[in-house]
Amino acid sequence: MIAGEGSGGVAVLPLGVAYDGLLALGLVLEEMATSGRRLAELVSGFPRLFMRKRELPCPPSLVYRVLERFRRHHAGDAPDCADGVRLSWDDAWLHVRASGTEPLLRIIAEAPAQERAEALVDKAAAFARRITSGHEGS
């Protein structure tokens, strides 16, 4: 099993976690060697997806109020609340969470079209701004 994150962290079980690109590079080279395929051939098998990220300043006193209101607003979308609020659809996902290091919300979306990813982030940011500005209507 392989897991990764945007900051470059890669975990390969049972090997562990590495925070540089050498492990990922080694895995790609190993796949190229064992499959006999070029990098372009490997990449062509992956779907083209667009990711958009936004950081939204949010006072620590309001972060969890925003997340709770967002979760309630999207209750029909079966939110995953293990780390903030994550919504998943067939074609896209959206994740809103508190930063662990700064007074802000991190909003991330991924979709097969750039416009869809941007729209998801824009809508979540607007929702959060209404709460942080005191205009809580959803």
PLM feature spans:
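Phosphate-binding and adjacent anionic-ligand microenvironments
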Residues: M1-S138
